[in-house]
């Protein structure tokens, strides 16, 4: 069983910074999107970027047809509805945010958590099977990744991640990046 530690998280997050090709643009969006969403100063492409990032971070390991289908579904949403929702995220609790985000076409709980991460990276982090599986294998989550991922499961994951970030004295983005690297399939 893998054991998570502060040193492992820091090391793997640094590996992420050195090796993940999307890290620069991801950093830029983590820096600018929270304010843009909160202020309502964003366009459709800014919102669409989050959906594209969720799938494209797999670097071709996510089925292309499914990725394209989900991206197209998201593009079909009424932008005024998306704009209003993203502008109101900061005032919502996690249940309401997930409920409203998953009501959008092309957005399931994992994609909704990407929106939460980019709206408030100090409070939320994205989840998918890969990240969840690392925590399960390390004994930090008792159950394997549910399929489909429910809002209640995300809250369990988020609570555990917040506790680990506190324990390891790191932010949630650092923890996410470590989990992603620890779940990277062998090349």
Region locations from a protein language model:
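A short glycine-/small-residue-rich loop at the edge of a beta-strand within enzyme catalytic domains
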Residues: 88, 92, 122, 152
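Generic alpha-helix detector with strongest preference for long hydrophobic helices that associate
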Residues: 31, 82, 96, 111-116, ...
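Helix-hairpin-helix/helix-loop-helix acidic hairpins
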Residues: 59-107
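Homeobox/homeodomain signature
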Residues: 40, 91-97, 116-117, 165, ...
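Generic alpha-helix signal with a bias toward terminal, lower-confidence helices
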Residues: 62, 86, 113-119, 136-139, ...
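C-terminal accessory module of base-excision DNA glycosylases/AP lyases that mediates lesion recognition
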Residues: 1-57, 124-187
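Catalytic DNA-binding helix-loop module of base-excision-repair DNA glycosylases/AP lyases
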Residues: 96-137
């Amino acid at each position: 069983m893998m054991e998570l530690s502060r040193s492992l998280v820091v090391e793997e997050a640094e590996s992420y910074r050195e090796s993940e090709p999307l890290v620069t643009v991801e950093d830029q969006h983590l820096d600018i999107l929270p304010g843009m969403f909160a202020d309502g100063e964003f366009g459709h492409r800014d919102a669409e970027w989050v959906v594209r990032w969720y799938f494209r971070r797999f670097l071709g390991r996510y089925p292309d047809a499914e990725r394209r289908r989900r991206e197209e579904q998201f593009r079909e949403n009424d932008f005024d509805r998306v704009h209003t929702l993203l502008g109101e995220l900061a005032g919502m609790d996690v249940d309401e945010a997930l409920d409203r985000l998953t009501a959008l076409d092309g957005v399931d709980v994992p994609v909704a958590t990407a929106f939460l991460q980019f709206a408030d990276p100090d409070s939320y982090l994205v989840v998918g099977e890969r990240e969840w599986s690392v925590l399960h294998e390390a004994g930090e989550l008792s159950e394997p990744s549910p399929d489909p991922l429910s809002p209640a499961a995300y809250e369990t994951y988020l609570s555990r991640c917040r506790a680990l970030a506190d324990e390891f004295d790191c932010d949630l983005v650092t923890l996410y990046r470590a989990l992603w690297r620890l779940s990277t399939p062998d090349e």
